[in-house]
Each structure stands twice: as C-alpha cells, then as structure tokens.
Amino acid sequence: MDLFKAFGGKSNSKDIAKERLQLLLVHDRIDTSPRFLEMIKEDILNVISNYVDIDEKGLRVEITKERKSDDTFISALHANIPIKKMKQVIR
C-alpha cells in the first residue's frame, strides 16, 4: 500500500521508486520481507493518525541490526514521523 495515496496525497514515480528501494535495503539488512516492513508502517500510521496529523512525505521507518558488545545482534525499529499538528482527542 502506498502511504501517499492512502492519505489522499499524490505520489510520483520517483517517490514510489525511492520507497521501494528503501524497503529493499532494509530487507537486506535484517533478512525480512519488504512487505513485513510495509505492514508495520501501515499499522503505526493507523494508530498514530488517531492522535496527530502526520507529514507522510517525511515519514521514515526502518529496522536495523546492530552488534552488541557481547557479539550478539539486536534488531531495532526506528521511526521518524513528522507531526503536522495534534488532534483534539476526547475520551
């Protein structure tokens, strides 16, 4: 699912190619499918968009794998989600 189209924005082929390349690079780093990362991004956006308006063009979600001091590896999810404004949430 294209994040730009999901929220009514338009994307061009450059944006789509860039997003696909980023997903492939992450896939290579952590041995998971690009679709898995896309599903995580969709879920994060669905939850966060209940509380804030997000700038989808600046959205970056990636999973990295880093070596710890004991030579084991740990994966980490990094999300950079630019917030346009907070929504008024009544509970």
From Swiss-Prot:
BP term (GO), one: regulation of division septum assembly
SUPFAM superfamilies per record: Cell division protein MinE topological specificity domain
Superkingdom, taxonomy of origin: Bacteria
InterPro entries: MinE (IPR005527), MinE_sf (IPR036707)
Keyword terms: Cell cycle, Cell division
Signal sequence residues: none
Record-stated family: Belongs to the MinE family.
Physiological role: Prevents the cell division inhibition by proteins MinC and MinD at internal division sites while permitting inhibition at polar sites. This ensures cell division at the proper site by restricting the formation of a division septum at the midpoint of the long axis of the cell.
Full protein name: Cell division topological specificity factor
Species of provenance: Caldanaerobacter subterraneus subsp. tengcongensis (strain DSM 15242 / JCM 11007 / NBRC 100824 / MB4)
Encoding gene per record: minE
